[in-house]
Curated annotation (Swiss-Prot):
InterPro entries: Nxph, NXPH/NXPE. It holds the Pfam family Neurexophilin. Residues 22-30 are annotated as: IV (linker domain). Belongs to the neurexophilin family. One of its GO terms (cellular component) is extracellular region. The keyword Ribonucleoprotein does not apply. This is Neurexophilin-3. It is found in: Secreted.
Amino acid sequence: NATGQGNISISLVPPSKAVEXHQXQQIFIEAKASKIFNCRMEWEKVERGRRTSLCTHDPAKICSRDHAQSSATWSCSQPFKVVCVYIAFYSTDYR
């Protein structure tokens, strides 16, 4: 995001499974080259709002803070494995 602060979590589940998202502990997993998926976004919603609270630098003042929450649905699949064969043949006496 624009501030450089934020969390994102990604889970791969079957389409038939109901999923609930909750703000929970952060888990960082190193990506492996063998786990490659083709993904596309199917649905996205962004909710923006403004909150007011006491300023941290001067508690006598009120500061406003903009925030945004995004939700998205992605569809992912494993890429197709295609075998490509290229044969070059040259001969002056082909039988």
